[in-house]
Structures are given as C-alpha cells and as structure tokens.
C-alpha cells in the first residue's frame, strides 16, 4: 500500500505519512498511441571490416615535431605593396559594382533581417535581471514558484523583513503612500549588423561630407534657397486688443440734427474772386458764372461788360491750366502745348532715339511735317496714312538741311523718309531743263543703292512723286548698255539712282559729271561695304564739287545758317554700323544727326520667327513640302538658299509639289531678274527661290512667308532676309531650318529670338552648346557664292 512503512511483523504495523518532496516530480510523458507502428530497423548498408590479411599496411609513425623556442620557424615573407593595392582595388571595384537582386530575394532578405531583430529583442526581454525580474519588470518564473498549498516561497534574496512583502519600489518614506510608480519603460530594440560601429561611423562621416559638398555646389550655382514662410495668401487674424470699441454705433449720432454748424454750411470764396480753394475747374466755372450774373443784376450796363471780361479771363485760365496738365495724352494736345515730357513719351512710344546737337522734335502727323501743300496732297494720293517712326524722326531733321545717319530696321519706310526732303530741296532750285548748260552739268541729287533691284525699286517709288512735280528720274544700273543709259540722260535728270560700280564706269567714260550735285543719299550703306563698294563710293564722293561743302564747325548744326546758303547735304541709311561705314561717315558727313529706330540689327516686331532644327537636305525638302501644302500661307512666298547651285534644284522640287516657282541669283541676266520679280509681284508665280541677292531692298508686296532653307552666314543677312515679310505694318512669318553647320550664328539668333515679343526660342537651340556663348569670328570666312554676284563683286 502506498504511504505505509512496515516494521517486519505482520501484526504490528505502524502507518506514517511519507515526507513531502521538496519539489514536485516531473509529469511523465504520455504513452504513445496504440495504433502507432514501431519504426523500421536501419538498412544494412555498413561494409564489414576486411580480414587481417587483406588490410593495408599501417602508415609509418610521424615524427614528433619539436615545439618551443628551438623549433624551426617558417621563413617570413614580406608584404607586397602591389598585392595589397591590387586587393584593395578589387575590393573597391566589387563594392562599387551594383549587384542585382530580384524582388523575391529583396523580400527574403528583409524578412530575415526583421526576424533577427525580433528574435534579438525577444531574447533581450527574456533575460532575467539581478532582482529576479525580467527586462519588462515582471518576476521570473524560475525565482518564484508556487507550492502545493498555494503560497509562494522564494529563495531568500534580501533581509528577512522583506521576504514576504513586495519588492520596494521607492524610498522608505514613500512606501506606505499611494504613489503609482510604474516600472521603467523597456529599452528600444537594438539592431544587430555584421559590421562594427567604426565602419558605420566612418561611412556615415563620408556620406555627410559628400552631402555637405553637394549642398555647397548647389548653393553656388543655384543660389540660396528662400526659406521664408511668409505667404500673402495666408489669412491673418487682426488683433482687436488695441482697437477702441464704442458702446454705440455711428448711426446713433444725432448731433447733426440740432447743431447749426452742420445745418447751415458757409461757402467761403478765397484765393481770387470766384475761386474756392481745393475745388476742381467745374466748380470754379460755376462760381464764376454765378458771380457774373450777380454783376449783371446789379448794373445792367457796366456790369454786363465786366461779366464778359470775367468769363473771358476764366476761359483763358482754363486753357492755360490744360496746357500744363499731365492727365492728357500727347495725341490729345496741340503742338504748342507739347512739353519735354510729352516728347519723351512720344519717342518711347515709337522707339526713337536721337543723337547730335540741336535735333528738332519728330513730327506727330503729316500735317505737322512742314512739307509743302503739293507734296502733302501727293502723300495722301500715294496712300501714306500715318508716318512710320523713321519718317517721323528723319523728315524734320532733313528739312533743316542737316546731315543725317539713319539706323533703322529693314522694311521701315526709309525710301520716303529721304525722297520727300530731297524733293523739297530740289524744288527750290532752278529747273534743270531751263538752260542747256544745266543739262550737261549733271544731276542735282544722286541716290546710291547696293543692288540693281533696290535701285529700280527706289526709281519706281520716286516716280510716284516726281512725275506730278515735273522732275526727271533716271536709274543707272548694270545689265543695260551704256548707249541706252546715255540716251536716258540726253534731256538731263534732277535725280539719278545708281549702283556704285556702274556710276563709276559712267563717270570714267565721260557720260556723266557731278558738277552741280548738292544732295547725296546712300541707302543700305552697310550692304554696299559688304559687297566691296567702299572704293567706288569714295571715288564718287571725291568727284563731288567742294564749293558747296559744309564747314566742320558748330554752324553745321545751325539750321538757319545752313538754309541761308545751299550747302551740300549728305544722308546715309543703314541697318548696322560696321567700322567701314563709320569711316565713310566721319570723312564725308559734317556734324550729322543720328536717328536710331529700335536697336541696330533687330528685326521688326511684326515678323514671327520660327526656328526648326532639321539636318539633311531630304528632311528639309520634306518639311518644305509640308509647309507649302498646309494652306496656312498664301503666295507670294520667298525661299532663301546660300548657294546659287541650290536655287534651281529647290525650284524643281517646288514645281513637283504643284507650285509655280522662279529663281533669282547672280548668274541671271538683268532681263531674267526683272522678269522673275515682275512675275512674283503680279501674282503669276507662287514661290521665289533666291540667294542673298534678294535679301535686301526687294519689296514684293504682301509676302506672307519667308523660308530660310539654309541659314544665313551672318545675323545681319538673316535680319534682312526675314525683313521681306511683315512690311508696311503688316504681319508675317519667317521659318528657318537650322543645323549643326550654323553654329557660328546660333548665339546671335537666340538673342534675337529672345528680344522678339512674338517669337519663341526652341529648346534645341536654347540648350545647344554653340548658343551658350558668343563665338570668335576673327577667323570666320564667308562663302564667295553667298552674295549672289560670283566674282563680279556686284559692280555691274
């Protein structure tokens, strides 16, 4: 029987309880289930040992190596620097080379890392501390165990007085008070990595240094970031602590009902009879009329006279005040009321700038120009409604017999600005056909133009004014025989329009003299210098008489002194001012007034410039076909190329597209040139394909589109090319095909597009390397075929 101890005799048996064990025995494991089968025996795969006679001989015993200070040490090999450097380079290359990890591998690595961190944190929390609690503050089950009676007994870990009580959690004075002292918070989870802290700190320092260096570079090039938190849109509450609030509203004020100062207002008149200080003119007029009526009522005879005088004085005062007022625009004022401020605003409106002494103010309309009545009637008949900026500024200066340099954009109406003062000048001279000797002394005025087409165009424009006035105009250009031109000069001519080369030939052949020439005009002077006409121009100007040359003193700026004597007057018009043009101006012009419209070399604001980066002839031809067939632009259309050989090829391509086309270049005869321009002007031809020969001065009306199939060699030529459209205040479009071969002009082209208010710079041009800085043109060489004259230098 359990729990009973016998002493050996059957009758005497003493029953005693067994002593309680110190600990409960462990619970035995449950028996295996009955249906579980026994595991099978292991397979007999072991090989039996070989018999003694078949066993291999035993190896000889190894000699016991000597250990200690007397043992032979292996020879030490020195470290190879090259090997260390090679290993370091391989390690750096392997570390720098990116390693591709698939998405599944990245997820697996992340899960393993997270599991390790969780396991490390769990182990850290489960480790018991010295006071018998784990890291979270709870008691460890290995320290406190429950006895069979249900009480808790623990191994003594402190004084006897504290064994059966709670563990103290504070000072003795605070133990019996109800203070809730929570256990300390658990430590933050620690992350374990394979690398030590020194490597991490070093890598972190390198990353911080690289980030600081990148921030400095960004601040240098991008500027400091604006860290202001101010926002104008942010609503702010107004504080009312300093605002005094009354206990009543303003509508409750009844002081005006019984106060006589508010009921009977006194009308005070001071600062002159009838004037109330601080009031406007309308109130002053009312008071003046009231005072005049009072005078008439008092005295019918003398009072009415005095009243009329007062009203007249008020009217003159009002006119005098309106003369100096600032609220009216210059277009609403009379000429005598214009002040210096009004003229400054007027010049800014038309982008006019003048230099020189005693320069007169520009004209606001044709009626204020000072031209004779007969010329004003012709101007109205021709159809000039409003003067252009160059006409507003140049005509008043030229009418004062001043020398003039006009710097204006192409297509700005320069022809009329020098023709009208010229006609006024020669209309005061004797008729050239009055005596025979006057016919033989040459013309009164000469007009020099760089190309034949421009000279003929000036002749057509001049005949609109000279035929009604009875003056004779003759053009002398190449392409015509000398006999034909001599026949045109048989009756004399007041005005001769010529190219410099042919005019020099006529002077050397004694077909023409300049004995009485007193008016010289050079149109497109910079173009004449580009074509090599500097020497012919100097010969022509040296052939002029010196008896009527102006003095190079301050009298040349005095209009009264210049008009008292018929001095020679010289005018020069140009789009740019190269050094050769300045040299001619200093030599032959006397104290000239300089008029600049806009900026030198700029295109007019009426031309929309489009630039397309297209490389290759085939792609450009395809793009040209798309533009012409789009129907956006109506003929006439001008296509510019750089080389004469390309003109005919492009013209053939355009004809295959279904459009009529003609060519214009230096190899054409004069008759072919005139026929080509006439066909474009009368509308029988849609497209004109030309070189820079047609880039200047060719006035084809209503050109809607200019296509630069090849970009011009200089920005000046480009300016005059696109100036063929958008003339006389009309709008136009210029499309340019650009390639890498045009790197020399990309910077200037980008600057011109940025200045134009209606044009846009394409991103390809904006980011191109050649468009970032101005190139060095010291060694730039222009093509010989670009001028359109071949080896003739444009003289004929």
Swiss-Prot record:
One of its GO terms (biological process) is mRNA processing. Residues 113-126, 761-771 have a biased composition (Basic and acidic residues). It comes from the Eukaryota. Keywords: ATP-binding, Cytoplasm, Helicase, Hydrolase, mRNA processing, mRNA splicing, Nucleotide-binding, Nucleus. It comes from Neosartorya fischeri (strain ATCC 1020 / DSM 3700 / CBS 544.65 / FGSC A1164 / JCM 1740 / NRRL 181 / WB 181). This is Pre-mRNA-splicing ATP-dependent RNA helicase prp28. ATP-dependent RNA helicase involved in mRNA splicing. May destabilize the U1/5'-splice site duplex to permit an effective competition for the 5'-splice site by the U6 snRNA, resulting in the switch between U1 and U6 at the 5'-splice site. May also act to unwind the U4/U6 base-pairing interaction in the U4/U6/U5 snRNP, facilitating the first covalent step of splicing. Residues 606-769 form the Helicase C-terminal domain. Residues 18-60 have a biased composition (Pro residues). Residues 1-12, 127-148, 786-796 have a biased composition (Polar residues). Its EC number is 3.6.4.13. A motif (DEAD box) lies at residues 523-526. Component of the U5 snRNP complex. GO terms for molecular function: ATP binding; ATP hydrolysis activity; nucleic acid binding; RNA helicase activity. It catalyses: ATP + H2O = ADP + phosphate + H(+). A motif (Q motif) lies at residues 364-392. The Q motif is unique to and characteristic of the DEAD box family of RNA helicases and controls ATP binding and hydrolysis. It is found in: Cytoplasm; Nucleus. GO terms for cellular component: cytoplasm; nucleus. Belongs to the DEAD box helicase family. DDX23/PRP28 subfamily. The keyword Cytoplasm applies. The gene is prp28.
